[in-house]
Amino acid sequence: HELMDRAGARVVEQISARWSGLEGLRIVVVCGKGNNGGDGLVVARLLRQSGVDVVTYLLEPESCFGTDARIHAQRLRDAGIETQLVQSPAELELATHDLIVDAILGTGIRGSARPREAAFIEVLNLSGLPIVAIDLPSGLDADTGVIDGAAIKASLTVTFDLPKIAHLFYPARELCGALALTEIGFPAAALDACPSNTHLLTSEQVGGALPRRSAIAHKGTCGSVGVIAGSAGMTGAAALAAQAALR
């Protein structure tokens, strides 16, 4: 649950930075039953303790929560902060608020959101309010970037330590809005132990692999490039590769 504390703190920091402080904001936090919902409970507590007007909706009773999320639900109660269990999207009161925190579904989803979750997602999207997604907009598959059904269209997505494929690949990338990559201190050994055949190549890595050129270098001193590519009607890639070599 300590990671949830840190995740929630990073989300609050990003909200404060993007909205030029927390003063005067009226925020709705919508929580599912999983770890993403637990992060949302931390956000709700920290916002309320910062003097923000917060309404926290739970899509499931606390008896359905995971262990860590239950801990943070208890902390809310200990702080005297109320939550509201809702059965349908019609119970959400959104019109008088400034923004929504989406904590319905996280990286554990496979396939599409269930019909009940999808109904809440659709109502949040139609509200016209900016939405801050915790880790991943609800409804997206973190591992594919595919949109299969209803998904939150976020203004800001706050994720932790490493980006997910859905943060980088379209069409899912479009639903993430601005992406804030923050650190919460996942153990390096745990990250290294996660098998992955996907590697993120950055411009810094590519630039670091290029040899340094002499100040008096020119095209005659830097070797030759042969481009073998393209076919009739499909010559765009060949042209781009040749232009890149010339530059």
Descriptions of predicted regions:
Residues E13-I104, S112-I134:
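Nucleotide and nucleotide-moiety/phosphate-recognizing core
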Residues R10, I71, T83, A90, ...:
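A broad, structure-centric signal for solvent-exposed, well-ordered loop/edge residues
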Residues H1-E60, G66, L156, H167-R247:
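Small-residue (G/A/S/T)-rich helix-start motifs and N-terminal tracts that mark the onset
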Residues H97-L99, I104-S196:
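Internal gly/pro-rich beta-alpha loop/helix module
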